């Protein structure tokens, strides 16, 4: 259970950072009078999500390899 708390906490932390960045960016767009297109929103979030998923996957694979080989 403890091993699952760390990745979940990391995902929560990264989510909060991305939300604050989006709010800052939204505030800057409102000042300029321009709007972001849906494609820009999706692209930025998709890249962040891919990076987080990749890191979490690599960490889980490394943990599994460590447990299976007994080199922990």
Swiss-Prot record:
Q: Which UniProt keywords apply?
A: Amphibian defense peptide, Antibiotic, Antimicrobial, Cleavage on pair of basic residues, Cytolysis, Disulfide bond, Hemolysis, Secreted, Signal
Q: Does the keyword Metal-binding apply?
A: no
Q: Membrane-crossing residues?
A: none
**One GO CC annotation, please?**
extracellular region
Q: Which InterPro entries would you find in this protein's record?
A: Antimicrobial_frog_2, Frog_antimicrobial_propeptide
Location in the cell reads:
Secreted
Task: Describe, from its UniProt entry, the tissues in which this protein is expressed.
Answer: Expressed by the skin glands.
The UniProt entry's sequence similarity note says:
Belongs to the frog skin active peptide (FSAP) family. Brevinin subfamily.
Say what the protein does. Answer: Antimicrobial peptide. Active against a variety of Gram-negative and Gram-positive bacterial strains. Not active against fungi. Shows very weak hemolytic activity against human erythrocytes.
Q: What is this protein called?
A: Brevinin-2SN4
